[in-house]
Amino acid sequence: MEMTHAQRLILSNQYKMMTLLDPENGERYRRLQTIIERGYGLQMRELDRDFGELSEETCRTVIDIMEMYHALQVSRSNMKEGQSIDERRVTFLGFDAATEARFLGYVRFLVNTEGRYTHFDAGTHGFNAQTPMWEKYQRMLKVWQACPRQYHLCANEIMQIINA
């Protein structure tokens, strides 16, 4: 992250204020302030993670994934007696915090800030699947989008989607 001296001074002052406003995270802010003031290039790259960017297309794909899971859950709940699919199979797990943090952050934003998909269980890890899920979800989306009645799936269609 390239910054002018003026930008670094402004950001340093912001971290100083945040230390006063949020003492619980004061140590983190003081560390970031030191990095900015001294211009430690390697550590300044950490700031890039705080200012990520998701394209509109990627955001729509994440929403499509969550909508697919909503459809799976609705379809499962509408199934007749005798047809059973384990609820855990249609539970949205989220994304891997280590490798898919941008997607995970967007999911948390949608649920916690925007109030969407609040019926999804965040679990104890807050939608951190702890394993990469993007490719799996892409395969599932292709199967789901090919279904003629996406919100009235039969047991066979549900199984095809979750096994994709």
Curated annotation (Swiss-Prot):
Gene3D superfamilies: Helix hairpin bin (1.10.287.680), yfbu gene product, domain 2 (1.10.3190.10). InterPro entries: UPF0304_YfbU (IPR005587), YfbU_alpha-helical_sf (IPR023146), YfbU_helix-hairpin_sf (IPR023145). Belongs to the UPF0304 family. This is UPF0304 protein ESA_00925. It comes from Cronobacter sakazakii (strain ATCC BAA-894) (Enterobacter sakazakii).
